[in-house]
Design a protein with these regions (language model features):
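Large intracellular
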Residues: 2-9, 13, 25-160, 264-271
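Cys/His-clustered metal-coordination modules, chiefly Zn-binding fingers
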Residues: 163
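Lipid-exposed faces of alpha-helical membrane segments in multi-pass integral membrane proteins
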Residues: 14, 18, 69-82, 184-187, ...
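Helix-termination/interfacial motifs at the ends of transmembrane alpha-helices
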Residues: 167-236
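Juxtamembrane "helix exit" motif at the C-terminal ends of alpha-helical transmembrane segments
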Residues: 19-37, 84, 184-204
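Channel- or pocket-lining gating/hinge segments that regulate access to a cavity or pore
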Residues: 4, 153, 157, 206-271
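Membrane-spanning helices that line or support transport/gating and their immediate boundary helices
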Residues: 29, 33, 81-92, 196-199, ...
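Charged, alpha-helix-enriched surfaces in structured cytosolic catalytic cores
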Residues: 70-73, 127, 131, 147, ...
Length: 271
C-alpha cells in the first residue's frame, strides 16, 4: 500500500509538470499569437465600419491567464481520474475470477479456511492489495480464529467500508480542483471588471475598445471556468459511481461465494 501511495504521489506530480509544460507551450505558440492577430484584424475592421460585429473566436476566449490555469487544472484532474479509473477497472476484473474453489454442495468449515485461502494468497503482490482478495482473506482468517459466521460477515463489511472511505479520501484533491476552477474564473471576472472601470474615462470620450476588451476578459474567464467545472464534475461523479459499485460488488461476491458456504459444526454452535 505504501508503494502504491508513493506511485500515486509521483504520478500526480509528474502529470502536473507535464500538463503545465504542454498547455503553456500551446498558449505561447498557438493560442495567444492567433488571439492577438484576430483581435488586431477585428479592431481594424471596426475602425473602417462602425456597424461591424466581430465574431467570437475560440482563441480570444481562451487567451487569458485565468483560462490557461483552469485548463491546466482540468487536465491535471482528468489525469488523476484516469489513473484511478484504470485501477478500479483492474480491481473489477477480479470479480470475474473464481478465487474460492468450491464444488457443489461443499461447505467451508473453520479448519478448512487455511486451504481455501491459499489460491487467494497465490495472487501477485499487487493483486493481493486489491479489495476483493483482502476481504476474502480477512473473512477466512476471522472464520478460522472465531468459528463465527457473524464475525466473518462483520469483518468483510468493515473491510469494504474502510476501502470506500479510503477511496473517498483520495478524491479530495480532485474535489479541491473542481472547487478552485470556478473561483479562478471569478478572479478573472473581477480583474476584467476592475480594468474596465479604470478605462471608463475613455468610454466617455467615445473610445470603448478598451472597455469592451476588459469586459471580454471578465465574461470569457467565467464562461471557460464554468464549462470546465461542469465537465470535471461529470467525470468525477462517474468515477465515484464506478468505485461505489466496486465496493458493493465485492461485498456481494463475499456473501455469495464465501459466507453463504460457511458452516460451523454443531458442537461448536452449542458451545
Amino acid at each position: 500500500m505504501k508503494q502504491g501511495s508513493l506511485y500515486e504521489a509521483l504520478f500526480q506530480i509528474g502529470a502536473l509538470i507535464f500538463v503545465v509544460i504542454v498547455v503553456h507551450a500551446t498558449y505561447v505558440t498557438v493560442i495567444r499569437p492567433n488571439a492577438d492577430l484576430i483581435q488586431e484584424q477585428q479592431q481594424l475592421l471596426q475602425q473602417q465600419d462602425e456597424n461591424f460585429v466581430p465574431e467570437r473566436s475560440v482563441f480570444i476566449i481562451l487567451r487569458d491567464f485565468e483560462q490557461e490555469t483552469c485548463i491546466i487544472l482540468m487536465l491535471w484532474a482528468i489525469a488523476i481520474i484516469s489513473m484511478k479509473t484504470q485501477h478500479t477497472l483492474r480491481e473489477r476484473a477480479l470479480l470475474d475470477r473464481t478465487l474460492i474453489q468450491l464444488q457443489d454442495g461443499v461447505s467451508i468449515l473453520p479448519e478448512d479456511s487455511r486451504n481455501y485461502s491459499r489460491p487467494v494468497q497465490a495472487l501477485s503482490s499487487k493483486e493481493r492489495e486489491f479489495l476483493l482478495p483482502r476481504a476474502l482473506l480477512a473473512g477466512l482468517h476471522r472464520f478460522q480464529s472465531t468459528e463465527n459466521i457473524q464475525a466473518v460477515s462483520s469483518i468483510v463489511k468493515d473491510t469494504c467500508e474502510s476501502e470506500a472511505d479510503r477511496m473517498e479520501t483520495e478524491l479530495t484533491i480532485v474535489r479541491y480542483i473542481a472547487w478552485a476552477i470556478p473561483s479562478i474564473g471569478f478572479l478573472g471576472t473581477v480583474r476584467g471588471i476592475g480594468t474596465a472601470l479604470g478605462q471608463a474615462y475613455q468610454a466617455v470620450s467615445g473610445d470603448i475598445v478598451g472597455v469592451t476588451q476588459s469586459l471580454g476578459v471578465a465574461f470569457n474567464s467565467t464562461f471557460v471556468a464554468l464549462v470546465v467545472s461542469i465537465l470535471l464534475m461529470f467525470l468525477l461523479h462517474q468515477l465515484q459511481l464506478l468505485q461505489d459499485r466496486l465496493v458493493l460488488d465485492c461485498q456481494n461476491y463475499c456473501d455469495a461465494r464465501l459466507i453463504r458456504h460457511m458452516q460451523v459444526p454443531e458442537k461448536n454452535e452449542k458451545s
